[in-house]
From Swiss-Prot:
Biased amino acid composition, Basic and acidic residues: 534-546, 577-624
Gene field: Ssrp1
Residue numbers of Phosphothreonine PTMs: 170
UniProt-annotated stretches for the region Disordered: 458-709
Skewed-composition ranges (Polar residues): 696-709
Name assigned to this protein: FACT complex subunit SSRP1
First and last residue of the signal peptide: none
Origin organism lineage: Eukaryota, Metazoa, Chordata, Craniata, Vertebrata
Protein species of origin: Rattus norvegicus (Rat)
Length: 709
């Protein structure tokens, strides 16, 4: 027989909400840990009095009763697990795990039985439903009625608000069945009534959340916060954890009370009650109980008369009444010697405390993250201009918390702490490459060389120089944005001619070198622009006279049916119209679609016929264009063979016109294709006289005639 049994995905009903967790049975007892809150139910083996197995909504359930009247119910078991649990109970707890079915007759009359902290409504020997009396918040009586109201759980999608019982009168004298019923409920119910005197009162305590100053009255079963505007009554059963945290300035203390369910102020929910104390403030406290009652109730944890620091008195009383341990920071110590780290969360600055089993951030908004719910952490490096880093935590549920603006000096301490707690570090490979002193990270400020930043600065300078050069030399450059008949080779020829013209000028050696450097830059930029334009011109250069592609059957039908769809659905958007048309097309019968398929086939045949005619006419024109291009290239090669006379003619033509154009450039424009002639006919007729005067002086004509020979 196994010493322990463990079950995952077991559910516990808490005021209408099903919370999942893990159940572990051992020789010593039964432990259930809530996955959401981390709360642990620990049932000692000697306290168990009864175990019941029954069918419930989530499969099968286990109901446990203890000697002090507490009832624990866990659901989510499989039917096959009964034998294993039954044998375990017999062997280790010496209890018989009984099977008991619920009544499903649907009757609304029966017998009410009170057992421990449970109200059971039975029909015969079978229970119909059970009500934990600790969930009752109010009990009121009428003539023959008793009404129970319940505490609400914000996590429950559907909540039970109240139950009303009709109690018939009896013939017994002196016994009121309605009052007897109500007293049985109130004796075990969690009804918050400020009856009697408080055990003690703390006056005008500073509260950070909810903000204000409150008088705290300590009652046996609940805590009463009384402020100028709001009152809060907090049952001790809703307190999950207590934290006592020293402030970074070493002069103040935080006392944090974790609550589930939270207290509410309008639509705002407070999961944490945070009190702020000064270490220098002392108090003398006298409990409103005699010494015998104090000794019997608190067993030496409290005395009738106590004195000391205010924060010590509050924490000591709360620990005794709530019966929870107080969590304090562990052995973590930051760069400044404090047990916390200054950082920012969301829009507010606060303090992050690394604890032995989690992290807690105070104070706005307070956050508590347990180690067992952390998936991984990440050290996010800050920018090069800051001296800080970010600490990111992602939970197993996918929630991410980012604590930013942490001083870089805290990096080493925090990294060592996370490593010691064996938390998964997302960027571990990067961090293990850092030396133990973390000097490389610590020196990552604005003085460090950033190669990417330097490269961006250099590129910006080059762009600025090019912009200045283009504005200074605008008289020497031609319009590069309009060269429709020009190839990439023509760009190089144009700049070569400019280079020769500048070299023949009467400038110094340094000016010539500077001019060549600028011209090479411009040539490179022009080539880049040409390469970018080339891809776009491929799309823009589509012949408008070419036949259009045929439409598909769906598009033909859509164009014909568009107006009808609009009239059937007035105000429909384009997107919705397309979706609606797609739905109609899918729902059409095959016979109706065949009509549009035939139309699409006819359109395809017409397109193929038109394309053949178009390709035939285009082939003849392309042959003529190729022959003209060959003549153009031949003329350029011949011109290169006689550069001396050409250069002198260029220098003389430059004095006449700011924009230089050689004769072969003019002639190449004149010998362009028939398509370009029709577009540029009007422009050439206006500029022909100016080009003859400015671009072809007598010396240029002589050189051209010499090359033709």
């Amino acid at each position: 027989m196994a010493e322990t049994l463990e079950f995952n995905d077991i559910f516990q009903e808490v005021k209408g909400s099903m919370n999942d967790g893990r159940l572990r049975l051992s020789r010593q007892g039964i432990i259930f840990k809530n996955s959401k809150t981390g709360k642990v139910d620990n049932i000692q083996a000697g306290e168990l009095t009864e175990g019941i197995w029954r069918r419930v909504a989530l499969g099968h359930g286990l109901k446990l009763l203890t000697k002090n009247g507490h009832v624990y119910k866990y659901d989510g078991f499989r039917e096959s697990e009964f034998e294993k649990l039954s044998d375990f109970f017999k062997t280790h707890y010496r209890l018989e795990l009984m099977e008991k079915d619920l009544c499903v007759k649907g009757w609304n009359w029966g017998t009410v039985k009170f057992g421990g902290q449970l109200l059971s409504f039975d029909i015969g020997d079978q229970p119909v439903f059970e009500i934990p009396l600790s969930n009752v918040s109010q009990c009121t009586t009428g003539k023959n009625e008793v009404t129970l109201e319940f505490h609400q759980n914000d996590d429950a999608e559907v909540s039970l608000m109240e139950v009303r019982f009709y109690v018939p009168p009896t013939q017994e004298d002196g016994v009121d069945p309605v009052e007897a019923f109500a007293q049985n409920v109130l004796s075990k119910a969690d009804v918050i009534q400020a009856t009697g005197d408080a055990i003690c009162i703390f006056r005008e305590l500073q509260c950070l959340t909810p903000r204000g100053r409150y008088d705290i009255r300590i009652y046996p079963t609940f805590l009463h916060l009384h402020g100028k505007t709001f009152d809060y009554k907090i049952p001790y059963t809703t307190v999950l954890r207590l934290f006592l945290l020293p402030h970074k300035d070493q002069r103040q203390m935080f006392f944090v009370i974790s609550l589930d369910p939270p207290i509410k102020q309008g639509q705002t929910r407070y999961h944490f009650l945070i009190l702020l104390f000064s270490k220098d403030e002392d108090i003398s406290l006298t409990l409103n109980m005699n010494e015998e009652e104090v000794e019997k109730r608190f067993e030496g944890r409290l005395t009738k008369n106590m004195s000391g620091s205010l924060y010590e008195m509050v924490s000591r009383v709360m620990k005794a009444l709530v019966n929870r341990k107080i969590t304090v920071p562990g052995n973590f110590q930051g760069h400044s010697g404090a047990q916390c780290i200054t950082c920012s969360y969301k829009a507010s600055s606060g303090l992050l405390y690394p604890l032995e089993r989690g992290f807690i951030y105070v104070h706005k908004p307070p956050v508590h993250i347990r180690f067992d719910e952390i998936s991984f952490v990440n050290f996010a490096r800050g920018t090069t201009t800051t001296r800080s880093f970010d600490f990111e935590i992602e939970t197993k549920q996918g929630t991410q918390y980012t604590f930013s603006s942490i001083e870089r000096e805290e990096y080493g301490k925090l990294f060592d702490f996370v490593n010691a707690k064996k938390l998964n570090i997302k960027n571990r490979g990067l961090k293990e490459g850092i030396n133990p002193g973390y000097d490389d990270y610590a020196d990552s400020d604005e003085d460090q060389h950033d190669a990417y930043l330097e490269r961006m600065k250099e590129e910006g300078k080059i762009r600025e120089e090019n912009a200045n050069d283009s504005s200074d030399d605008s008289g020497e450059e031609t319009d590069e944005s309009f060269n429709p008949g020009e190839e990439e080779e023509d760009v190089a020829e144009e700049f070569d001619s400019n280079a020769s013209a500048s070299s023949s000028s009467n400038e110094g050696d340094s000016d010539r070198e500077e001019k060549k450097r600028k011209q090479l830059k411009r040539a490179k930029m022009a080539k880049d622009r040409k390469s970018r334009k080339k891809s776009s011109e491929g799309k823009k250069g589509k012949d408008p006279n070419a036949p259009k592609r045929p439409m598909s059957a769906y598009m033909l039908w859509l164009n014909a049916s568009r107006e009808k769809i609009k009239s059937d659905h007035p105000g429909i958007s384009i997107t919705d119209l397309s979706k609606k048309a797609g739905e109609i097309w899918k729902g059409m019968s095959k016979e109706k679609k065949e009509e549009w398929d035939r139309k699409a086939e006819d359109a395809r045949r017409e397109y193929e016929k038109a394309m053949k005619e178009y390709e035939g006419g285009r082939g003849d024109s392309s042959k003529r264009d190729k022959s003209k291009k060959k003549k153009k290239v031949k003329a350029k090669l011949e011109k290169k063979s006689t550069p001396s006379r050409g250069s002198s003619s260029k220098s003389s033509s430059r004095q006449l016109s700011d924009s230089f154009k050689s004769k072969e450039f003019v002639s190449s424009d004149e010998s362009s294709s028939g398509e370009n002639k029709s577009k540029k006919k009007r422009r050439r007729s206006e500029d022909s006289d100016e080009e003859e005067l400015a671009s072809t002086p007598p010396s240029s004509e002589d050189s051209a005639s010499g090359s033709d020979e």
